Regions:
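N-terminal signal-anchor/signal peptide hydrophobic helix marking the start
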Residues: 6-15
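Alpha-helical transmembrane segments of integral membrane proteins
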Residues: 2-4, 92-129, 143, 167-307
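Membrane-interfacial helix-loop-helix junctions in multi-pass membrane proteins
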Residues: 52-62, 76-87, 163-171, 189, ...
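An internal, D/E-rich "acidic patch" concept
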Residues: 57-113
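A hydrophobic, multi-pass inner-membrane permease signature
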Residues: 138-146
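Hydrophobic alpha-helical transmembrane segments of membrane transport/permease proteins
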Residues: 15-66, 154, 158-176
């Protein structure tokens, strides 16, 4: 297991550098960020040259990338064009998005897996058909429609929640936004769990456990559920990074100043330092989540062992 972890960590190095280089190049293709600092009028050539020199934009792209990565390994993610450190923006945005992601994951795990197990064990029955139809409806509706509808009904019309989240973003105010973020993934987790449970319920090892006279609850939890969760864990693991970086629309709807909001502002203002800095952290989150998922395979299924 130890050698496997070391090998995976070594494999992450080229993936990390390749991904960050690609993002860095894509951000530089967006246009001249200095031009956006002067508003509608054109920047004075002397001022523009001074700003490019200050932010290192007068150097070749490959040299900018090497300088940036060297600073990253010292904990310096650069400075936004408004003079604020990117690390300060991260310190404000990431705790909010982490709380939002945890709320969304709880919805996915608790509701999604529970519904998947129930429908998988009752395949073809009315509850199975009902859940399949409901999940298909949820998948078909865009996230921004779900968010705006819940905000209008629960926040504006009925007054159950605040229409917008306060600056501190406490957990109780993130419940509905978390449900909106998790809605589509929750539906996929439900359907994936249902399919996996239904397939493994006919497996030989489950029939053997039943033939031995083991209690039904033990057969489901200890044997059927553990092996059926492998594809679900894979989906949830890859969904962690998507939830943290892909909640731009939901954060805009509920006025949440998290990672999605900062990425939106960075792209809108062509603030390359902010965009690259946040995406660099998200890449690390993706890589760490994938490694944890691989290690969980051996916990869920004893047949899987890493040399």
């Amino acid at each position: 297991m130890g050698r496997y972890v070391i090998r995976r960590l070594l494999q992450m190095i080229p993936v990390f550098f390749g991904t960050t280089l690609l993002i860095f190049l894509m951000v530089n293709v967006m246009g001249d960020p200095i031009a956006g600092l002067c508003g509608e009028r054109q920047c004075d050539p002397a001022t523009a040259a001074q700003l490019r020199s200050e932010f290192g934009l007068d150097k070749p792209v490959w040299q900018q990338y090497l300088t940036y990565m060297g600073n990253v390994f010292t904990g310096d993610f650069g400075t936004a064009f408004n003079g604020q450190k990117v690390t300060e923006l991260m310190a404000t945005a990431f705790p909010i998005t982490i709380r939002l992601t945890i709320v969304a994951l709880l919805f996915e795990i608790v509701i999604g897996i529970s519904l998947g197990v129930v429908t998988g064990l009752r395949r073809g029955r009315p509850i199975d058909t009902t859940v399949l139809i409901l999940t298909l409806v949820v998948i078909s509706i865009p996230t921004f429609v779900t968010g705006l509808l819940l905000q209008l009904l629960l926040g504006v019309k009925w007054g159950i929640i605040h229409p917008s989240v306060s600056s501190g973003a406490p957990v109780n105010e993130l419940i509905i936004p978390g449900l909106v973020v998790a809605s589509v993934s929750l539906a996929y987790v439900t359907r994936l769990t249902r399919t996996s449970i239904a397939e493994n319920a006919r497996a030989d090892y489950v029939r053997t456990a039943v033939a031995k006279g083991l209690p039904r609850r033990r057969v489901i939890i200890r044997h059927l559920l553990r092996n059926s969760l492998i594809p679900v864990v894979t989906f949830i693991g890859t969904d962690v990074g998507a939830l943290m970086g892909g909640a731009i629309v939901t954060e805009r709807i509920f006025n949440i100043h998290g990672v999605g909001y900062q990425l939106y502002q960075g792209i809108l203002r062509q603030n390359s330092q902010t965009v690259v800095g946040f995406v660099t952290i998200l890449v690390l989150v993706f890589l760490a989540a994938n490694l944890i998922v691989d290690l969980l395979y051996a916990v869920l299924d004893p047949r899987i062992r890493y040399a």
